[in-house]
């Protein structure tokens, strides 16, 4: 009788050990996943910082380019105004006979 009860006890101990091993494996997997997630978050943070620096550089460069083209436009408008003024001046001078 004692052997039968001991055999049942051994089975119960083995079952408990098996469950403990299963829980241990699950916990190990969970810890590994958490560590992997932490690494992924670190990688994403680094990417975000790089993108932020790149976007800041792009913003600065685009502002410089916009300013450069604005000045080109202003110079062109001033040049056109000067040419139109000179043409009008010649027309007025010819009309009044200043060159005769």
Swiss-Prot record:
Ranges in the topological domain labelled Vesicular: 97-100
Stretches of the chain found on the membrane's Cytoplasmic side: 1-75
InterPro entries cross-referenced by the UniProt entry: Synaptobrevin-like, Synaptobrevin/VAMP, V_SNARE_CC
UniProt subcellular location: Lysosome membrane; Early endosome membrane; Late endosome membrane; Cell membrane
Site, Interaction with STX8: residue positions: 33
PTM section of the record: (Microbial infection) Stearoylated By S.flexneri N-epsilon-fatty acyltransferase IcsB, thereby disrupting the host actin cytoskeleton.
CDD domains per UniProt: R-SNARE_VAMP8 (cd15868)
MF terms in GO: chloride channel inhibitor activity; SNAP receptor activity; syntaxin binding
Residue positions where Phosphoserine is found in the record: 5, 18, 55
Cell membrane in keyword set: yes
GO cellular component: azurophil granule membrane; clathrin-coated endocytic vesicle membrane; cytoplasm; cytosol; early endosome; early endosome membrane; extracellular exosome; late endosome membrane
Tissue distribution: Platelets.
Lipidated positions per record ((Microbial infection) N6-stearoyl lysine): 64, 68
Principal subcellular localisation of the protein: membrane
Topology term for the membrane: Single-pass type IV membrane protein
Keyword Oxidoreductase: no
GO biological process: autophagosome maturation; autophagosome membrane docking; defense response to virus; mucus secretion; negative regulation of secretion by cell; positive regulation of histamine secretion by mast cell; protein transport; regulation of protein localization to plasma membrane
Pfam families cross-referenced by the UniProt entry: Synaptobrevin (PF00957)
PROSITE patterns with a match to the protein in the record: SYNAPTOBREVIN, V_SNARE
Keywords on record: Acetylation, Antiviral defense, Autophagy, Cell membrane, Coiled coil, Cytoplasmic vesicle, Endosome, Lipoprotein, Lysosome, Membrane, Phosphoprotein, Protein transport, Transmembrane, Transmembrane helix, Transport
Phosphothreonine carried by residues: 28, 48, 54
Transmembrane segments: 76-96
Job of this protein: SNAREs, soluble N-ethylmaleimide-sensitive factor-attachment protein receptors, are essential proteins for fusion of cellular membranes. SNAREs localized on opposing membranes assemble to form a trans-SNARE complex, an extended, parallel four alpha-helical bundle that drives membrane fusion. VAMP8 is a SNARE involved in autophagy through the direct control of autophagosome membrane fusion with the lysososome membrane via its interaction with the STX17-SNAP29 binary t-SNARE complex. Also required for dense-granule secretion in platelets.
Family, per entry: Belongs to the synaptobrevin family.
Stated name of the protein: Vesicle-associated membrane protein 8
